[in-house]
Design a protein with these regions (language model features):
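Short amphipathic alpha-helical interaction segments
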Residues: 72-92, 97
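Short acidic, hydrophobic short linear motifs in intrinsically disordered regions
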Residues: 48-73
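Short, Lys/Arg-rich nucleic-acid/phosphate-binding segment
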Residues: 99-109
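Short, amphipathic alpha-helical interaction segments positioned at domain boundaries
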Residues: 110-146
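Short alpha-helical segments that sit at the start of domains
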Residues: 6-52
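Exposed, interaction-prone assembly regions rather than primary DNA-binding/catalytic cores
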Residues: 4-12, 28, 34, 131-146
């Protein structure tokens, strides 16, 4: 999977370090940030993996406003979820798509979305792109409790 060239992300060290989570770095729009946070929380509750059907059901729930933020229904278009949130997370390597997993219940292989947890050192590199990448990956890892 590749990342489209028209994707705009502010990768300044100041923005990355001052952001509260990885979604503030990846997405400019507040509504998109909220949708991605909800998705990450939902995915974490499922052990970091979900089938295409489960992700589709989650996208439907976003569209119909069944998911709440602070007791208020949150609506986000299914199309925007797939095109903006899911595509960027897969394209940047935060999620893997079509990962084969053996399903003990049905006794067959199923293909799922799987969150990546990055193996990063305890200390960040000193300068440059790798330093910024380190902090982005650390923020992503902190999103998932497993």
């Amino acid at each position: 999977m590749y990342l489209r060239s028209d994707v705009k992300i502010d990768l300044s060290e100041e923005k990355v370090l001052s952001s509260s989570d990885v979604f503030e770095v990846l997405f400019d729009n507040k509504k998109t940030q909220n949708a991605s946070r909800l998705f990450a929380k939902w995915l974490d509750s499922k052990g970091g993996r979900a089938s295409k059907a489960e992700v589709s059901k989650f996208a439907d729930q976003l569209q119909t406003g069944e998911i709440m933020i602070n007791e208020v229904p949150f609506k986000y278009s299914r199309r925007n979820f797939y095109i903006t949130v899911l595509r960027k997370l897969v394209g940047m390597g935060f999620l893997q798509r079509n990962v084969p997993v053996w399903d003990e219940k049905s006794k067959k292989t199923s293909y799922v979305y799987l969150s990546n947890t990055f193996d990063i050192p305890k200390k960040p590199p000193s300068v440059g792109f790798w330093r910024i990448s380190y902090f982005i990956c650390r923020k992503w890892n902190q999103t998932f409790t497993r």
